[in-house]
Amino acid sequence: MNEQYYSTGRRKTASARVFIKIGKGKIKINYIDIKKYFNQKTYITLIKKPLEIINMTDKLDIFITVKGGGISGQAGAIRHGIARALIKYDSSLKTTLRDSGFITRDSRCVERKKVGFKKARRRPQFSKR
């Protein structure tokens, strides 16, 4: 019973490929341990949140390859990918993960810069005279 479950997660411009199999709770991101890849504890807790809700932190090994975006976007993409892979592992988890908001893809991304503006919404300074 060495089955592997695969899913993708996306956030901003980052995309993560997540592979889950039954193990001892190891998490590797791009062949690097999670604590070395994300040195801030907030990102590690964000990633482990779906596993904590279903009490599977020490039962699954997770291997992740992530590309694009920054640290925050990559952490969000990994969390999204883990949640989707857990549903493939056990479909009965879908309701609990959906209620927690892990399945829904966060569609917020950077607003584009408009012509004539300094930034996305910042207009040039107005001069009366």
From Swiss-Prot:
Tell me the GO BP annotations in alphabetical order. translation
Q: List the gene name.
A: rpsI
Q: Which PROSITE patterns match?
A: RIBOSOMAL_S9
Which SUPFAM superfamilies does this UniProt record tie to the protein?
Ribosomal protein S5 domain 2-like
**Would you tell me the protein name for this molecule?**
Small ribosomal subunit protein uS9
Would the keyword Ribonucleoprotein be found if you checked this record's keyword annotation?
yes
Per the UniProt record, the source organism is Wigglesworthia glossinidia brevipalpis
Q: Is Ribonucleoprotein found in the keyword set?
A: yes
Check the record and name the Gene3D superfamilies matching this protein: 3.30.230.10
* GO CC entries: cytosolic small ribosomal subunit
Q: Mind listing the GO molecular function terms for this protein?
A: RNA binding; structural constituent of ribosome
Task: Check the record and name the Pfam families matching this protein.
Answer: Ribosomal_S9
Key words of the record: Ribonucleoprotein, Ribosomal protein
